[in-house]
């Protein structure tokens, strides 16, 4: 009698669904308060002006305006610039 179970594939075949992370609004795009700009694990992109940071590190808009991505001292930062009607 064999004491080792044959290496079949019956115990395989499970996988988790993707988490739908990433940038949701790109540079220059119009946002309203509450719009999600970035979904991420950890602060890969840091919050700047007029954006909030959720407990799961989601960055969202606090005001109406345009999204702006920039790099300062090797940190990616996202801001929302207010639209001025001139």
Swiss-Prot record:
Stretches for region Disordered: 1-26
Gene Ontology CC terms: ribonucleoprotein complex; ribosome
Biological process according to GO: translation
One example GO MF annotation: structural constituent of ribosome
Family listed: Belongs to the bacterial ribosomal protein bL27 family.
UniProt-recorded name of the protein: Large ribosomal subunit protein bL27
Gene3D superfamilies assigned to the protein according to its UniProt record, in alphabetical order: 2.40.50.100
InterPro entries: Ribosomal_bL27, Ribosomal_bL27_CS
Pfam families: Ribosomal_L27 (PF01016)
Annotated HAMAP family: Ribosomal_bL27
UniProtKB keywords: Ribonucleoprotein, Ribosomal protein
Species, as recorded: Rickettsia akari (strain Hartford)
């Amino acid at each position: 009698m064999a004491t080792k179970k044959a290496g079949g594939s019956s115990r395989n075949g499970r996988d988790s669904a993707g988490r739908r992370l990433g940038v949701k609004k790109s540079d220059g795009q119009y946002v309203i308060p509450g719009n999600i700009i970035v979904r991420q694990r950890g602060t890969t992109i840091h919050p700047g002006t007029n954006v909030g940071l959720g407990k799961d590190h989601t960055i969202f808009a606090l005001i109406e305006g345009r999204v702006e991505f920039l790099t300062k001292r090797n940190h990616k930062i996202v801001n929302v610039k207010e639209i001025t009607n001139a």
